[in-house]
């Protein structure tokens, strides 16, 4: 199977049996021709998964370098989010050897991948993704991704939001030294004395690098940076979570106060949760964990190709929403948005016809048909909707509100 067919078949992957996957693809691309499962998988094993990393990064670079693109920002900054997620994979001796065991001692083996992503929360694009073992060093992965993000976004200003448990003292120091703007939620035990001493909701705090704070890093690669100074400064912002002002979170940041007053930090940090939604889309809507096979190379191909399709879907949905911005915001009771599930479903079903079409004019016509159909399917965005969280398996196997896209 040629490389282009191999690539297109993975983009077109629907998570059904491999025989039916190949039958469907070959009927569209090469009617009357068949390929065996072993022959197809043999070709797949020769393809480096990094090819799909290059593919989605190429798309991202074009997206951010487009002079006509209207990028969503907050006070002129792209809002990036860094976080990790567990990806369930088939448990075999090979996957255990490559990725490790995620289960506790003396329990059944369970192979997992730790996926670390850097995400543009406002433009809904996955900028970078790294496959790791479970329980990986998320901050180290995030730092590497932040260091290379300029290759994708160019010289555009950005800030990074991170959850509690992400940055420690060395990471804070490196980001401050490199002039990387960040917002990180603190645990109650992080800089506990400084948190308890806060007299206002927005203060500049001097963090003293005492012996007890340094000892954890002695003899490690972080020793030099924690010994390079006696103190450093953080801005701590208290964000109240309810009207009674009984619950709050403390955020650590180095953002300038004149551009980001304390009042905007609730909304700013809330944007980080869009990365959790992006992970849900990958796993639920795009069925990322419904793998082609059990070999590590196949798993990584499926993960990276799914990220590529996700970014394409968001690019199209965002383009439609910008084109119809006034109509979607003003002509309905609620602000309207493109139905992401339907967008993904249409792309999974129809994108293959565009990829296989050799005539550029027909390609354009086919894409316009998909574009027009997606633009007609919009759903309301209802603000401040909250549902009580119930733990446990209360629903049936098939959700009535989250139907499959394809």
Residue ranges and their predicted role:
Residues 15-29:
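Short, charged amphipathic recognition helices of the HTH superfamily
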Residues 100-103:
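Conserved mixed alpha/beta core segments that line enzyme active sites in large multi-domain catalysts
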């Amino acid at each position: 199977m040629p490389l282009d067919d191999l690539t297109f078949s993975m983009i077109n992957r629907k998570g059904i049996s491999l025989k039916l996957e190949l039958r469907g693809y070959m009927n569209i691309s090469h009617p009357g021709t068949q390929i065996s499962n072993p022959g197809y998988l043999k070709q797949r094993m020769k393809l480096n998964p990094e090819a799909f990393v290059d593919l989605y990064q190429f798309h991202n670079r074009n997206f951010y370098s487009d002079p006509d693109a209207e990028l969503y920002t907050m006070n002129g900054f792209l809002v990036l989010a860094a976080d990790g997620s567990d990806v369930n994979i088939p448990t075999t001796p090979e996957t255990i050897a490559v990725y490790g065991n995620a289960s506790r001692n003396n329990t059944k083996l369970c192979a997992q991948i730790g996926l670390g992503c850097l995400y543009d929360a406002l433009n809904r694009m996955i900028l970078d993704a790294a496959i790791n073992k479970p329980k990986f060093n998320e901050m180290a992965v995030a730092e590497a991704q932040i260091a290379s993000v300029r290759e994708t976004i160019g010289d555009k200003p950005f800030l990074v939001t991170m959850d509690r448990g992400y940055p420690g003292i060395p990471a804070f120091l490196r980001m401050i030294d490199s002039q990387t703007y960040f917002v990180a939620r603190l645990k109650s035990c992080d800089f506990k004395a400084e948190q308890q001493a806060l007299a206002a909701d927005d203060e500049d705090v001097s963090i003293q690098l005492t012996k007890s704070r340094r000892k954890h890093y002695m003899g490690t690669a972080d020793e030099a940076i924690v010994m390079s100074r006696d103190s450093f400064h953080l801005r701590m912002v208290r964000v109240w979570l309810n009207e009674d002002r009984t619950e709050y979170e403390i955020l650590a940041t180095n953002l300038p106060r004149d551009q980001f007053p304390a009042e905007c930090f609730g909304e700013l940090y809330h944007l980080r949760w869009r990365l959790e939604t992006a992970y849900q889309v990958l796993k639920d809507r795009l069925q990322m964990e419904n793998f082609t096979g059990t070999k590590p190379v196949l798993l990584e191909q499926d993960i990276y190709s799914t990220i590529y399709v996700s970014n394409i879907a968001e690019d199209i949905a965002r383009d439609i929403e910008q084109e119809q911005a006034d109509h979607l915001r003003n002509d309905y009771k609620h602000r309207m948005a493109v139905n992401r599930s339907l967008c993904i479903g249409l792309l999974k079903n129809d994108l293959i016809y565009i990829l296989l079409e050799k005539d550029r004019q027909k390609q354009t016509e086919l894409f316009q048909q998909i574009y027009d159909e997606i633009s007609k399917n919009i759903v309301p965005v209802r603000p401040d909707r909250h549902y009580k969280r119930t733990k446990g398996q209360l629903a049936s196997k098939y959700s009535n509100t989250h139907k499959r896209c394809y």
